[in-house]
Structure formats: structure tokens, C-alpha cells
């Protein structure tokens, strides 16, 4: 969900701890998970077999929603997508989104966003270059907030693309490996989706996931 902590700097040590190897999971079975958190706040439709979904929301959306398609078990496999995404004046993300079971963490690889950059109000971890662009990387701790296990305290990880885009291939492993230098578990994955999230304003998205 959205990040609200105050921005703080972070010194990066010269020698990083050993990084867990990413877990590769076969996706031969195709998309098998529908993310529908408060999809009733807009018009959410999807075709799981085709790997497509759409979300339309009107100004005055009353709460946070996260909708999308993906996999019951996440991995560091690359994800290729194409989208039509419009969120001008909306606090919204178009992102690879998912959870790690332990240490519990929520993560976003933000490809495009509306009027709010989550790294503007979180702890900076620096930058990582991937897929033709620099990504700002940041983290936040959420205390007693909704999670995959109910209400809990967990860490959020964000990579926010500076040269925003609405189609391409996301090399997920590049982000997981960078985050792992800062406590990201890089294993024991819960679900992973290509998602749209918003909690204000109006917007629309039509997304196709091809891998």
C-alpha cells in the first residue's frame, strides 16, 4: 500500500553482505493469480487466460485499491508487459507488485506513476540502473498495517523508474539483488503481479502481460 514515512538519508556501506541467490520459478503454467484489493472502487475487468486487465476509476476514489494479474508464487523472472495508463492528477502506480513471506516485505517496481513518487517520502537506498533507465530505490517500515497475514509490521521496497514507460520488459532480478543488500529476503515469495494502484484522483489502465 502507499508509503507515508518522512524522507531520510541512508549511508551505504562499502562492503555489502552476501546476497541470497534469486529463486527462479517456471511460468509454463501461465498467469494463475488475480489481485483484487478493493477493485470495486472502480471498474475492474480481466481475462486471466489472455493475461489482460483494465481498471477505470473516477475522481473521488474513497480508498486505496490494488488490482492486477500475475502468479501465486513470485520469482526473479523477467516480466514483459504493455499498457495504456493515464493517471494525471491521481496518486497511482503502474508497477510490478508483490510480497515476500519472510522476512515479510511488500515490494514495487514502479514503471509509471501519477502525481506521487513514493521515494519522495521514504528512506533512500540510492539508485539502480536497469532496462534502459535509472531507478530511484527507497524503503519504508509499515507498523501495524494491513498485510498478507492480517495486521503486521513489515518493510516496503520501491524501485521507481526515472524515465517512466508503459511497456517493456522488467528485469526483476536486478531489483531483487539490489534490495537484498538492504535486507530483502530474495526468497520465500508470495504472490507477484503486474498491478495498478491508486488512492486519489481519476485514471484508467489497460494492461497486457505476456511473460
UniProtKB/Swiss-Prot annotation:
Report the InterPro entries cross-referenced here. ConA-like_dom_sf, GH11/12, GH11_AS_1, GH11_AS_2, GH11_dom, Glyco_hydro_11
- GH11 domain location is 28-210
Major place of residence: secreted
Might you report a single GO cellular component term?
extracellular region
Q: In which pathway does it act?
A: Glycan degradation; xylan degradation
- MF terms (GO), sorted A to Z: endo-1,4-beta-xylanase activity
- Gene Ontology biological process: xylan catabolic process
Reaction(s) catalysed by this chain, per the record, are: Endohydrolysis of (1->4)-beta-D-xylosidic linkages in xylans
Q: Under which EC number(s) is this enzyme classified?
A: 3.2.1.8
Active site positions: 106, 197
Give the record's keywords alphabetically. Carbohydrate metabolism, Disulfide bond, Glycosidase, Hydrolase, Polysaccharide degradation, Secreted, Signal, Xylan degradation
Q: Which region is the signal sequence?
A: 1-27
Say which family it is in.
Belongs to the glycosyl hydrolase 11 (cellulase G) family.
Provide the protein name.
Answer: Endo-1,4-beta-xylanase 3
Q: Which organism is it from?
A: Aspergillus kawachii (strain NBRC 4308) (White koji mold)
Q: Which gene encodes it?
A: xynC
Amino acid at each position: 500500500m502507499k508509503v507515508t514515512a518522512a524522507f531520510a538519508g541512508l549511508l551505504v556501506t562499502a562492503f555489502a553482505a552476501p546476497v541470497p541467490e534469486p529463486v527462479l520459478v517456471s511460468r509454463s503454467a501461465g498467469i494463475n493469480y488475480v489481485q483484487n484489493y478493493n477493485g470495486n472502487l472502480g471498474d475492474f475487468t480481466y481475462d486471466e487466460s489472455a493475461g489482460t486487465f483494465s481498471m477505470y476509476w473516477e475522481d473521488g476514489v474513497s480508498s486505496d485499491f490494488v488490482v492486477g494479474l500475475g502468479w501465486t508464487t513470485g520469482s526473479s523472472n523477467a516480466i514483459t508487459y504493455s499498457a495504456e495508463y493515464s493517471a494525471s492528477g491521481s496518486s497511482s502506480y503502474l508497477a510490478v507488485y508483490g510480497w515476500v513471506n519472510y522476512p515479510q516485505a511488500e515490494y514495487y517496481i514502479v514503471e509509471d506513476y501519477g502525481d506521487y513518487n513514493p521515494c519522495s517520502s521514504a528512506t533512500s537506498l540510492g539508485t539502480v540502473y536497469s532496462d534502459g533507465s535509472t531507478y530511484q530505490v527507497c524503503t519504508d517500515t509499515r507498523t501495524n498495517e494491513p498485510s498478507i497475514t492480517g495486521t503486521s509490521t513489515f518493510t516496503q521496497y520501491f524501485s521507481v523508474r526515472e524515465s517512466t514507460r508503459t511497456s517493456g520488459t522488467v528485469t526483476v532480478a536486478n531489483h531483487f539483488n539490489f534490495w537484498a543488500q538492504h535486507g530483502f529476503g530474495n526468497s520465500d515469495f508470495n504472490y507477484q503481479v503486474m498491478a495498478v494502484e491508486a488512492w486519489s484522483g481519476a485514471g484508467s489502465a489497460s494492461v497486457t502481460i505476456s511473460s
